[in-house]
Protein backbone atom coordinates (compact mmCIF):
# COMPACT_ATOMS: atom_id res chain seq x y z
CA UNK A 1 0.00 0.00 0.00
CA UNK A 2 1.26 3.51 -0.82
CA UNK A 3 2.36 5.56 2.18
CA UNK A 4 2.78 8.76 0.19
CA UNK A 5 0.01 10.47 2.16
CA UNK A 6 2.43 10.58 5.10
CA UNK A 7 5.49 11.06 2.89
CA UNK A 8 4.60 14.11 0.77
CA UNK A 9 8.22 14.50 -0.30
CA UNK A 10 7.76 11.35 -2.41
CA UNK A 11 4.74 12.61 -4.34
CA UNK A 12 5.15 13.27 -8.07
CA UNK A 13 2.26 15.10 -9.70
CA UNK A 14 2.28 14.09 -13.35
CA UNK A 15 1.59 16.68 -16.01
CA UNK A 16 -1.92 16.40 -17.43
CA UNK A 17 -1.79 15.19 -21.02
CA UNK A 18 -4.21 13.85 -23.60
CA UNK A 19 -4.31 10.09 -23.95
CA UNK A 20 -3.63 8.36 -27.25
CA UNK A 21 -3.03 4.73 -28.13
CA UNK A 22 -0.05 3.02 -29.69
CA UNK A 23 -1.71 -0.21 -30.69
CA UNK A 24 -3.26 -1.52 -27.48
CA UNK A 25 -0.96 0.53 -25.24
CA UNK A 26 -2.46 3.74 -23.81
CA UNK A 27 0.00 6.65 -23.72
CA UNK A 28 -0.66 9.81 -21.74
CA UNK A 29 -3.46 10.72 -19.39
CA UNK A 30 -3.34 8.51 -16.33
CA UNK A 31 -1.75 5.56 -18.16
CA UNK A 32 1.50 4.11 -16.78
CA UNK A 33 4.64 5.58 -18.33
CA UNK A 34 5.43 3.25 -21.22
CA UNK A 35 8.95 1.88 -21.69
CA UNK A 36 10.19 1.67 -25.25
CA UNK A 37 13.31 0.46 -27.03
CA UNK A 38 14.46 0.10 -30.63
CA UNK A 39 15.87 -2.83 -32.56
CA UNK A 40 19.40 -2.55 -33.96
CA UNK A 41 19.18 -5.47 -36.39
CA UNK A 42 18.71 -5.08 -40.12
CA UNK A 43 14.94 -4.91 -40.51
CA UNK A 44 15.23 -7.15 -43.55
CA UNK A 45 16.62 -9.80 -41.19
CA UNK A 46 13.10 -10.72 -40.20
CA UNK A 47 14.01 -13.63 -37.95
CA UNK A 48 16.71 -11.68 -36.11
CA UNK A 49 14.49 -8.64 -35.70
CA UNK A 50 11.57 -10.67 -34.36
CA UNK A 51 13.93 -12.37 -31.89
CA UNK A 52 15.15 -8.99 -30.68
CA UNK A 53 11.61 -7.66 -30.35
CA UNK A 54 10.64 -10.75 -28.34
CA UNK A 55 13.66 -10.38 -26.04
CA UNK A 56 12.77 -6.74 -25.42
CA UNK A 57 9.16 -7.67 -24.70
CA UNK A 58 10.30 -10.39 -22.29
CA UNK A 59 12.36 -7.75 -20.48
CA UNK A 60 9.21 -5.63 -20.11
CA UNK A 61 9.19 -3.33 -23.15
CA UNK A 62 5.71 -1.99 -23.83
CA UNK A 63 6.52 -0.73 -27.34
CA UNK A 64 9.38 -1.43 -29.77
CA UNK A 65 10.54 0.82 -32.61
CA UNK A 66 11.89 -0.61 -35.85
CA UNK A 67 13.75 1.34 -38.53
CA UNK A 68 12.21 1.43 -42.02
CA UNK A 69 14.94 2.89 -44.27
CA UNK A 70 13.89 1.32 -47.59
CA UNK A 71 11.17 -0.57 -49.45
CA UNK A 72 12.59 -3.97 -48.50
CA UNK A 73 12.36 -3.02 -44.82
CA UNK A 74 8.77 -1.87 -45.28
CA UNK A 75 7.91 -5.24 -46.82
CA UNK A 76 9.64 -7.07 -43.96
CA UNK A 77 7.74 -4.99 -41.42
CA UNK A 78 4.46 -6.75 -42.15
CA UNK A 79 5.71 -10.09 -40.82
CA UNK A 80 7.51 -8.43 -37.92
CA UNK A 81 4.29 -6.71 -36.87
CA UNK A 82 2.35 -9.97 -37.19
CA UNK A 83 4.80 -11.86 -34.96
CA UNK A 84 5.44 -9.10 -32.42
CA UNK A 85 3.95 -9.45 -28.92
CA UNK A 86 4.00 -5.64 -28.51
CA UNK A 87 3.04 -2.68 -30.73
CA UNK A 88 5.63 -1.71 -33.35
CA UNK A 89 6.60 1.88 -34.13
CA UNK A 90 8.01 2.42 -37.62
CA UNK A 91 10.97 4.82 -37.63
CA UNK A 92 10.69 7.02 -40.73
CA UNK A 93 13.29 9.46 -42.07
CA UNK A 94 13.63 11.23 -45.44
CA UNK A 95 11.23 9.05 -47.45
CA UNK A 96 7.62 9.85 -46.60
CA UNK A 97 6.47 6.91 -48.73
CA UNK A 98 8.08 4.56 -46.21
CA UNK A 99 5.63 5.97 -43.67
CA UNK A 100 2.70 5.16 -45.92
CA UNK A 101 4.05 1.64 -46.53
CA UNK A 102 4.65 1.11 -42.81
CA UNK A 103 1.07 2.10 -41.98
CA UNK A 104 -0.16 -0.34 -44.62
CA UNK A 105 2.09 -3.03 -43.09
CA UNK A 106 0.34 -2.68 -39.74
CA UNK A 107 2.67 -0.46 -37.71
CA UNK A 108 0.94 0.86 -34.60
CA UNK A 109 2.70 4.21 -34.78
CA UNK A 110 4.81 6.18 -37.25
CA UNK A 111 7.77 8.19 -35.99
CA UNK A 112 8.41 11.10 -38.35
CA UNK A 113 11.28 13.59 -38.13
CA UNK A 114 10.25 17.18 -38.94
CA UNK A 115 13.82 17.89 -40.03
CA UNK A 116 13.75 15.49 -42.98
CA UNK A 117 10.23 14.22 -43.69
CA UNK A 118 9.53 16.92 -46.29
CA UNK A 119 6.91 19.61 -46.84
CA UNK A 120 3.35 19.73 -45.56
CA UNK A 121 1.99 18.02 -48.65
CA UNK A 122 4.09 14.94 -47.92
CA UNK A 123 3.19 15.01 -44.24
CA UNK A 124 -0.48 15.17 -45.24
CA UNK A 125 -0.10 11.92 -47.17
CA UNK A 126 1.47 10.26 -44.12
CA UNK A 127 -1.37 11.56 -41.95
CA UNK A 128 -3.94 10.08 -44.34
CA UNK A 129 -2.22 6.69 -44.24
CA UNK A 130 -2.07 6.82 -40.44
CA UNK A 131 -5.76 7.66 -40.21
CA UNK A 132 -6.75 5.00 -42.74
CA UNK A 133 -4.83 2.30 -40.87
CA UNK A 134 -5.57 3.35 -37.27
CA UNK A 135 -1.98 4.44 -36.68
CA UNK A 136 -0.74 7.05 -34.23
CA UNK A 137 2.17 9.39 -35.02
CA UNK A 138 5.17 10.56 -33.03
CA UNK A 139 6.63 13.91 -33.99
CA UNK A 140 10.27 13.14 -33.25
CA UNK A 141 12.39 16.30 -33.19
CA UNK A 142 16.16 15.81 -32.96
CA UNK A 143 18.70 18.56 -32.28
CA UNK A 144 21.00 16.98 -34.85
CA UNK A 145 18.53 17.19 -37.73
CA UNK A 146 16.62 20.44 -37.35
CA UNK A 147 15.12 22.22 -40.33
CA UNK A 148 17.48 24.56 -42.19
CA UNK A 149 15.33 27.65 -41.63
CA UNK A 150 15.37 27.09 -37.86
CA UNK A 151 19.14 26.72 -37.79
CA UNK A 152 19.42 29.96 -39.76
CA UNK A 153 16.97 31.69 -37.41
CA UNK A 154 18.61 30.59 -34.15
CA UNK A 155 22.20 30.13 -35.31
CA UNK A 156 22.58 26.68 -33.74
CA UNK A 157 20.52 23.82 -32.31
CA UNK A 158 18.83 25.08 -29.13
CA UNK A 159 15.71 24.38 -27.05
CA UNK A 160 13.72 27.18 -28.70
CA UNK A 161 14.44 25.82 -32.18
CA UNK A 162 13.52 22.27 -31.17
CA UNK A 163 10.24 23.30 -29.58
CA UNK A 164 9.34 25.55 -32.53
CA UNK A 165 9.93 22.63 -34.89
CA UNK A 166 7.69 20.40 -32.81
CA UNK A 167 4.89 22.94 -32.45
CA UNK A 168 4.95 23.69 -36.18
CA UNK A 169 4.32 20.02 -36.90
CA UNK A 170 1.66 19.75 -34.20
CA UNK A 171 -0.17 22.51 -36.09
CA UNK A 172 0.11 20.56 -39.35
CA UNK A 173 -1.41 17.47 -37.75
CA UNK A 174 -4.15 19.47 -36.04
CA UNK A 175 -4.95 21.37 -39.25
CA UNK A 176 -5.62 17.96 -40.81
CA UNK A 177 -7.84 17.04 -37.84
CA UNK A 178 -5.39 14.37 -36.66
CA UNK A 179 -4.94 14.17 -32.90
CA UNK A 180 -3.52 10.69 -32.23
CA UNK A 181 0.03 11.94 -31.81
CA UNK A 182 2.78 12.25 -29.24
CA UNK A 183 5.93 14.34 -29.45
CA UNK A 184 9.60 14.29 -28.44
CA UNK A 185 12.41 16.88 -28.53
CA UNK A 186 15.64 14.94 -28.10
CA UNK A 187 19.25 16.06 -27.92
CA UNK A 188 22.44 14.35 -26.83
CA UNK A 189 23.10 17.26 -24.46
CA UNK A 190 21.34 16.83 -21.12
CA UNK A 191 20.90 20.57 -20.53
CA UNK A 192 19.41 21.19 -23.98
CA UNK A 193 17.07 18.22 -23.71
CA UNK A 194 15.82 19.13 -20.25
CA UNK A 195 15.20 22.77 -21.21
CA UNK A 196 13.42 21.81 -24.43
CA UNK A 197 11.16 19.29 -22.71
CA UNK A 198 10.19 21.78 -20.00
CA UNK A 199 9.28 24.37 -22.65
CA UNK A 200 7.36 21.76 -24.62
CA UNK A 201 5.42 20.61 -21.56
CA UNK A 202 4.18 24.17 -21.02
CA UNK A 203 3.23 24.62 -24.68
CA UNK A 204 1.10 21.53 -25.42
CA UNK A 205 -1.07 18.89 -23.79
CA UNK A 206 0.15 16.22 -26.22
CA UNK A 207 1.68 13.09 -24.67
CA UNK A 208 5.45 13.48 -24.39
CA UNK A 209 8.00 10.81 -25.28
CA UNK A 210 11.24 11.29 -23.33
CA UNK A 211 14.75 10.47 -24.43
CA UNK A 212 18.35 11.65 -24.45
CA UNK A 213 19.38 10.76 -27.98
CA UNK A 214 22.74 9.18 -28.76
CA UNK A 215 23.43 9.03 -25.03
CA UNK A 216 26.46 6.74 -25.36
CA UNK A 217 27.52 3.31 -24.15
CA UNK A 218 25.97 1.27 -21.38
CA UNK A 219 27.59 3.11 -18.46
CA UNK A 220 27.85 6.67 -19.78
CA UNK A 221 24.48 6.50 -21.52
CA UNK A 222 22.78 5.15 -18.42
CA UNK A 223 24.15 8.01 -16.33
CA UNK A 224 23.19 10.70 -18.84
CA UNK A 225 19.72 9.24 -19.24
CA UNK A 226 19.19 8.86 -15.50
CA UNK A 227 20.08 12.52 -14.96
CA UNK A 228 18.19 13.89 -17.95
CA UNK A 229 15.08 11.72 -17.81
CA UNK A 230 15.10 11.47 -14.02
CA UNK A 231 14.76 15.20 -13.45
CA UNK A 232 11.98 15.51 -16.02
CA UNK A 233 10.06 12.56 -14.59
CA UNK A 234 10.48 14.04 -11.11
CA UNK A 235 8.82 17.21 -12.45
CA UNK A 236 5.93 15.08 -13.71
CA UNK A 237 6.92 15.39 -17.38
CA UNK A 238 6.83 12.30 -19.58
CA UNK A 239 4.31 9.73 -20.75
CA UNK A 240 6.68 7.29 -22.45
CA UNK A 241 10.45 6.95 -22.61
CA UNK A 242 13.36 5.31 -24.33
CA UNK A 243 16.86 5.06 -22.92
CA UNK A 244 19.12 5.26 -25.99
CA UNK A 245 22.26 3.19 -25.49
CA UNK A 246 24.96 1.78 -27.73
CA UNK A 247 24.06 -1.60 -26.27
CA UNK A 248 21.61 -4.48 -26.44
CA UNK A 249 18.01 -3.14 -26.53
CA UNK A 250 17.24 -5.34 -23.52
CA UNK A 251 19.66 -3.17 -21.51
CA UNK A 252 17.70 -0.08 -22.58
CA UNK A 253 14.53 -1.64 -21.19
CA UNK A 254 16.20 -2.60 -17.93
CA UNK A 255 17.62 0.88 -17.40
CA UNK A 256 14.28 2.47 -18.29
CA UNK A 257 12.49 0.43 -15.65
CA UNK A 258 15.19 1.12 -13.07
CA UNK A 259 14.76 4.87 -13.60
CA UNK A 260 10.99 4.57 -13.17
CA UNK A 261 11.35 2.25 -10.17
CA UNK A 262 13.72 4.66 -8.45
CA UNK A 263 11.03 7.36 -8.64
CA UNK A 264 8.17 5.06 -7.71
CA UNK A 265 6.52 5.59 -11.10
CA UNK A 266 6.48 1.95 -12.20
CA UNK A 267 7.27 -1.27 -10.44
CA UNK A 268 8.39 -4.48 -12.11
CA UNK A 269 10.47 -7.27 -10.65
CA UNK A 270 12.70 -7.30 -7.60
CA UNK A 271 14.11 -4.01 -6.38
CA UNK A 272 17.40 -5.00 -4.73
CA UNK A 273 18.68 -2.64 -2.06
CA UNK A 274 22.30 -3.44 -1.29
CA UNK A 275 25.26 -1.80 0.39
CA UNK A 276 28.56 -1.03 -1.40
CA UNK A 277 30.31 -3.31 1.14
CA UNK A 278 33.29 -2.57 3.37
CA UNK A 279 35.54 -4.33 5.89
CA UNK A 280 32.53 -4.91 8.16
CA UNK A 281 30.73 -7.18 5.69
CA UNK A 282 29.89 -10.64 6.96
CA UNK A 283 29.75 -12.11 3.43
CA UNK A 284 30.73 -11.15 -0.12
CA UNK A 285 28.03 -8.60 -0.86
CA UNK A 286 29.10 -7.75 -4.41
CA UNK A 287 29.21 -11.33 -5.70
CA UNK A 288 25.98 -12.14 -3.86
CA UNK A 289 24.10 -9.25 -5.46
CA UNK A 290 25.45 -10.07 -8.93
CA UNK A 291 24.27 -13.67 -8.55
CA UNK A 292 20.87 -12.70 -7.16
CA UNK A 293 20.26 -10.21 -9.99
CA UNK A 294 20.74 -13.03 -12.48
CA UNK A 295 18.77 -15.64 -10.58
CA UNK A 296 15.82 -13.34 -9.88
CA UNK A 297 15.41 -11.98 -13.40
CA UNK A 298 12.40 -14.23 -13.94
CA UNK A 299 10.44 -12.55 -11.16
CA UNK A 300 8.06 -9.95 -12.61
CA UNK A 301 6.11 -9.28 -9.42
CA UNK A 302 7.03 -5.91 -7.85
CA UNK A 303 8.77 -6.52 -4.53
CA UNK A 304 11.84 -5.46 -2.55
CA UNK A 305 14.91 -7.29 -1.29
CA UNK A 306 17.65 -5.91 0.97
CA UNK A 307 21.13 -7.42 0.96
CA UNK A 308 23.26 -5.65 3.56
CA UNK A 309 26.69 -6.78 4.71
CA UNK A 310 26.51 -5.90 8.40
CA UNK A 311 24.27 -4.78 11.26
CA UNK A 312 25.02 -1.05 10.94
CA UNK A 313 22.17 -0.48 8.47
CA UNK A 314 21.02 -4.02 7.73
CA UNK A 315 18.19 -4.35 10.27
CA UNK A 316 16.86 -0.87 9.45
CA UNK A 317 16.83 -1.48 5.71
CA UNK A 318 15.20 -4.88 6.22
CA UNK A 319 12.31 -3.20 8.04
CA UNK A 320 11.33 -1.60 4.72
CA UNK A 321 11.66 -4.60 2.40
CA UNK A 322 9.70 -7.77 1.69
CA UNK A 323 12.72 -10.03 2.13
CA UNK A 324 16.10 -9.17 3.60
CA UNK A 325 19.43 -10.62 4.61
CA UNK A 326 21.89 -8.97 6.96
CA UNK A 327 25.40 -10.26 7.53
CA UNK A 328 26.43 -11.30 11.01
CA UNK A 329 29.27 -13.33 12.44
CA UNK A 330 30.43 -16.94 12.42
CA UNK A 331 29.56 -17.46 8.75
CA UNK A 332 25.84 -16.73 9.02
CA UNK A 333 23.36 -13.87 8.90
CA UNK A 334 19.77 -12.99 9.66
CA UNK A 335 16.88 -13.48 7.22
CA UNK A 336 14.07 -10.94 7.45
CA UNK A 337 10.56 -11.53 6.15
CA UNK A 338 8.03 -8.70 5.88
CA UNK A 339 10.36 -6.44 7.82
CA UNK A 340 10.82 -8.75 10.81
CA UNK A 341 13.77 -10.89 11.86
CA UNK A 342 12.77 -14.45 11.00
CA UNK A 343 15.67 -16.91 11.21
CA UNK A 344 19.39 -17.32 10.75
CA UNK A 345 20.94 -18.79 7.62
CA UNK A 346 24.51 -19.81 6.82
CA UNK A 347 26.28 -17.72 4.20
CA UNK A 348 26.99 -20.71 1.96
CA UNK A 349 23.28 -21.59 1.74
CA UNK A 350 21.99 -18.03 1.75
CA UNK A 351 21.66 -17.39 -2.00
CA UNK A 352 19.55 -20.49 -2.68
CA UNK A 353 17.47 -19.72 0.38
CA UNK A 354 16.88 -16.07 -0.55
CA UNK A 355 15.81 -17.09 -4.07
CA UNK A 356 13.35 -19.54 -2.52
CA UNK A 357 11.96 -16.91 -0.13
CA UNK A 358 11.60 -14.33 -2.91
CA UNK A 359 9.79 -16.84 -5.13
CA UNK A 360 7.43 -17.73 -2.27
CA UNK A 361 6.71 -14.06 -1.57
CA UNK A 362 6.13 -13.34 -5.27
CA UNK A 363 3.68 -16.24 -5.51
CA UNK A 364 1.81 -14.98 -2.44
CA UNK A 365 1.61 -11.44 -3.83
CA UNK A 366 0.39 -12.74 -7.20
CA UNK A 367 -2.28 -14.85 -5.51
CA UNK A 368 -3.44 -11.87 -3.43
CA UNK A 369 -3.58 -9.65 -6.51
CA UNK A 370 -5.67 -12.26 -8.36
CA UNK A 371 -8.01 -12.56 -5.37
CA UNK A 372 -8.40 -8.76 -5.15
CA UNK A 373 -9.13 -8.56 -8.87
CA UNK A 374 -11.76 -11.27 -8.62
CA UNK A 375 -13.40 -9.55 -5.66
CA UNK A 376 -13.54 -6.27 -7.59
CA UNK A 377 -15.41 -7.83 -10.55
UniProtKB/Swiss-Prot annotation:
Catalytic activity field: (2E)-4-hydroxy-3-methylbut-2-enyl diphosphate + oxidized [flavodoxin] + H2O + 2 H(+) = 2-C-methyl-D-erythritol 2,4-cyclic diphosphate + reduced [flavodoxin]
Classification via Gene3D superfamilies: Dihydropteroate synthase-like (3.20.20.20), Sulfite Reductase Hemoprotein, domain 1 (3.30.413.10)
Pathway assigned in UniProt: Isoprenoid biosynthesis; isopentenyl diphosphate biosynthesis via DXP pathway; isopentenyl diphosphate from 1-deoxy-D-xylulose 5-phosphate: step 5/6
Keyword Iron-sulfur belongs to the record: yes
Cofactor note: Binds 1 [4Fe-4S] cluster.
Keyword Nuclease part of the UniProt annotation: no
GO biological process: isopentenyl diphosphate biosynthetic process, methylerythritol 4-phosphate pathway; terpenoid biosynthetic process
EC number(s) stated in the UniProt entry for this protein: 1.17.7.3
One Pfam family in the UniProt entry: GcpE
Binding annotation for [4Fe-4S] cluster: 275, 278, 310, 317
GO MF annotations in UniProt: 4 iron, 4 sulfur cluster binding; 4-hydroxy-3-methylbut-2-en-1-yl diphosphate synthase activity (ferredoxin); 4-hydroxy-3-methylbut-2-enyl-diphosphate synthase activity (flavodoxin); iron ion binding
Family from the record: Belongs to the IspG family.
NCBIfam families with a match to the protein in the record: ispG_gcpE, PRK00366.1
Function description: Converts 2C-methyl-D-erythritol 2,4-cyclodiphosphate (ME-2,4cPP) into 1-hydroxy-2-methyl-2-(E)-butenyl 4-diphosphate.
Protein name: 4-hydroxy-3-methylbut-2-en-1-yl diphosphate synthase (flavodoxin)
Organism: Ruegeria sp. (strain TM1040)
Taxonomic lineage of the native organism: Bacteria, Pseudomonadati, Pseudomonadota, Alphaproteobacteria, Rhodobacterales
Gene name of this polypeptide: ispG
Amino acid sequence: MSMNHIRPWRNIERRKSRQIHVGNVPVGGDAPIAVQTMTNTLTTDIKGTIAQVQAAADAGADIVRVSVPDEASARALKEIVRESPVPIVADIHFHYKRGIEAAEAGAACLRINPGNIGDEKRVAEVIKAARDHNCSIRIGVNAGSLEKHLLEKYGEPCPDAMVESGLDHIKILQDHDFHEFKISVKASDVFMSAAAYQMLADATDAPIHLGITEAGGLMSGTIKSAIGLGQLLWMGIGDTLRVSLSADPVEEVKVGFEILKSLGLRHRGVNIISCPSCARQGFDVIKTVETLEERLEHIKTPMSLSIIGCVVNGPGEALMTDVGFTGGGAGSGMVYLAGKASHKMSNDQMIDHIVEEVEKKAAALDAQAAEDMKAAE
